[in-house]
Regions:
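Long, intrinsically disordered, low-complexity Ser/Thr/Pro-rich regulatory/activation regions
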Residues: 70-78
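Short, Lys/Arg-enriched anionic-surface-contact patches
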Residues: 1-12
Length: 78
């Protein structure tokens, strides 16, 4: 039986990071650079991909479902 590999440390860190709150978008982007050592654009690309990954849903269901709802609401606004 082929088991899906688990999320790597960076993917888990992105999900954990997204559970935090920030005072402004600038503060969040600065924290992404400093704490995760990645560009904010890359962070959001990875986060968006994780929202469609069943492994991410299993690892952080509350966070993933909340972000899916936010993403869907933004899509419907367009």
């Amino acid at each position: 039986m082929d088991a899906q590999p688990s999320l790597d440390d960076r993917e888990l860190a992105v999900l954990a990071f997204e559970g935090r709150s920030f005072t402004s978008p600038g503060a969040k982007e600065r924290a992404v650079r400093e704490e995760l050592d990645m560009a904010p654009v890359r962070y959001f690309q990875l986060l968006n991909a994780l929202l469609d990954d069943p492994r991410a849903l299993a690892a952080a269901p509350v966070t993933v479902n909340r972000l899916r709802r936010v993403r869907e609401a933004k899509r419907q606004e367009r």
